[in-house]
Amino acid sequence: KLGWSPDVVHCHGWFTAMVPAYLKTAYKDDPTFKDAKVFYSLYEEDFANASLGTKYAELASQVDIDAADLAAYGSGSFVDLTKGALSFTDVVVKSDENIDPEIMSYIKDNNIRVFAPASDDDYEAFGDLYDEFVNEEVSA
């Protein structure tokens, strides 16, 4: 156990694509994560024409996640992995300008909140975003 509960779990990039699904399904009743919000950062990246395959979601479904919850992960392509992650995400952090148009359409169609900082160094804007979700003051 962590000994504390995060207010926000911020996932960065495609390799964290399953984390939002686990947090919102398998760990939804866990006292450590039940109130945590999921942020997912998008970057200008792609697998080109490669795919992790349909086995990717199949393997993940072996641990307390229903196959229906993983349907958005589809073929295991970069776009499908991202859409799967976004289906369990509270806030998208748009970290690059050139995000796949299909992903941006998915965000719009599903009314997912988008945070687009002026730069990755805009610490004040990130701080303000995180402050919206912090449940209580942290004392040092």
Regions found by a protein language model. Name each.
Residues 1-140:
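Catalytic cores of nucleotide-sugar-dependent glycosyltransferases that transfer UDP/GDP/TDP-activated
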